[in-house]
Swiss-Prot record:
Disulfide bonds: none annotated. It comes from the Bacteria. GO terms for cellular component: plasma membrane. It is a multi-pass membrane protein. The keyword Plastid does not apply. The chain crosses the membrane at residues 49-69, 106-126, 145-165, 188-208, 220-240, 256-276. The lineage of its organism: Bacteria, Pseudomonadati, Pseudomonadota, Gammaproteobacteria, Cellvibrionales. Belongs to the UPF0761 family. This is UPF0761 membrane protein CJA_2282.
Length: 427
């Protein structure tokens, strides 16, 4: 028996962490592909192309409401273009400024069109985020209205407050700059754009999905997304400055470059969303007990039935705590939702919506793609000395198993037992 030493313990722990990281990265890549994030980024790119000017126009309109903020519109625009667009996209920023200035002179009908375009942009973003988090339905009614109204109205005003504060801090830096011999203030102001990006991405991951997202996960995801975004920005600017796009496209080079930049930006943002969603579910997925799909489905349906008796629903993480892997639950939930055995609430939780007295085990197995194959005896087996006896025994087993699989789930679960004897709901 090998003795444990600090070196072997460190090596074993390092290998465990490495395997955890490899599994987590594999899950992120698999989820990124399964959620069709590249396709979603393409659709959001075209939507952004149409909605950028309306969003800028709405921002100007909200600034004009408060006299103290009326002069901040151009400053905010320059700030966004400086820290969001690569350094080589001056043409795009100039075009967007001109388009926005012309849009502010539209009639009320044109203004309604701009607001609708901005609304559709936000709706499309929520739809793609809900798809990543596995939420079947987006916000509806008053919740939907309040969210988008807050973004379109309060968002620009909060940006104005932040910009006014930054102006004050800039003045403060000029005032005390001579006393900052260590250059601390200069370092702080150098990373202010990073902090703003971090806050924006974190808020995006927390507020947009129609489900509860842990703030600490959103903070980690927002930080990594900010780092990836800044790296992408630097790499993109370097590639453009060392390429011959202008020679090929001439005066039209700005448009394909802008589309490419927006598409890559959305790919980074959606990748960050996949990362945030995967943190908790990979941790839970480590408890995977490798249940067969039929047994896992029965386990989920049983707990959902017990939850319904209590007037409750079950969240996705509660279901994963039962011992299912993330991949297995995504596969089973798609089939159970498609057969209307379960349903998803507006909050993203799951409820049972099927009469268990009408659903048999064999039907459930067929729906989830695991129809039972009954044992049989082939010709070679019959020629063996014990072949005929085995055929009779296996035939009896076959009949008994067939009768068992024809049981309804209500009979299988014996749902008339006392509620107190039910296993506790996973917490």
């Amino acid at each position: 028996m090998a003795l444990s030493t600090p070196v072997t313990d460190f090596k074993q722990g390092f290998l465990q962490q490495l395997n955890w990281l490899k599994g987590f990265l594999y899950l992120i890549v698999q989820q990124y592909q399964a959620k069709a994030c590249q396709k979603s980024a393409a659709s959001l790119t075209y939507m952004t192309l149409f909605a950028t000017v309306p969003m800028m126009t709405v921002t100007y309109a909200m600034f004009s409401i408060i006299p103290a903020f009326q002069h901040l519109g151009d400053q905010l625009q320059n700030l966004i273009f400086t820290h969001v667009l690569p350094n080589n996209e001056q043409d795009i920023s100039r075009y967007l400024k001109n388009f926005s200035a012309q849009a502010r002179q539209l009639t009320w009908l044109g203004g309604v069109f701009l607001v609708v375009s901005a609304y559709l942009m936000l709706k499309n973003i929520e739809k793609n985020f809900n798809a990543i988090w596995g939420v079947a339905q987006g916000r509806r009614g008053i919740a939907n209205f309040l969210l988008y109204w807050a973004i379109l109205s309060l968002g620009p005003l909060l940006l104005g407050v932040a910009l006014a504060m930054s102006t004050y801090l800039t003045s403060f830096r000029l005032l005390v700059g001579s006393y900052d011999s260590l250059g601390v203030l200069e370092l702080v102001f150098q990373y202010v754009p990073w902090l703003l990006n971090w806050a924006a991405f974190t808020l995006l991951f927390v507020a947009v999905p129609n489900c509860k997202v842990p703030t600490r996960h959103a903070l980690v995801g927002g930080l990594l997304t900010t780092i990836a975004f800044q790296a992408l920005k630097a790499i993109f600017a370097w590639i453009v400055s060392h390429s011959s796009f202008t020679l090929v496209y001439g005066a039209f080079a700005a448009l394909p470059l802008f589309l490419l930049w927006v598409n890559m930006t959305w790919m980074v943002i959606l990748g960050g969303a996949v990362f945030v969603h995967s943190i908790k579910f990979y941790q839970i997925g480590l408890r995977d007990r490798a249940y067969p799909d039929v047994f896992a489905s029965l386990l989920v349906i049983w707990h959902l039935h017990q939850a319904s008796l209590r007037g409750q629903s079950m969240s996705e993480w509660q279901i994963l705590l039962l011992g299912l892997s993330t991949q297995q639950w995504q596969r089973l939930s798609k089939r159970l939702l498609g057969r209307h055995v379960i349903a998803q609430t507006q909050q993203g939780d799951f409820v049972l919506c099927y009469d268990l007295s009408l659903l048999t085990l064999s039907t459930l197995a067929e729906w989830i793609g695991q129809r039972p194959d009954w044992p049989g005896v082939d010709e070679l087996t019959r020629e063996l000395p014990w072949g005929q006896a085995s055929e009779q025994v296996l035939g009896a087993v076959d009949n008994a198993r067939a009768q068992s699989w024809d049981l309804t789930l209500s009979a299988f679960f014996a749902v008339n037992q006392a509620l107190d004897n039910a296993p506790p709901l996973a917490r």
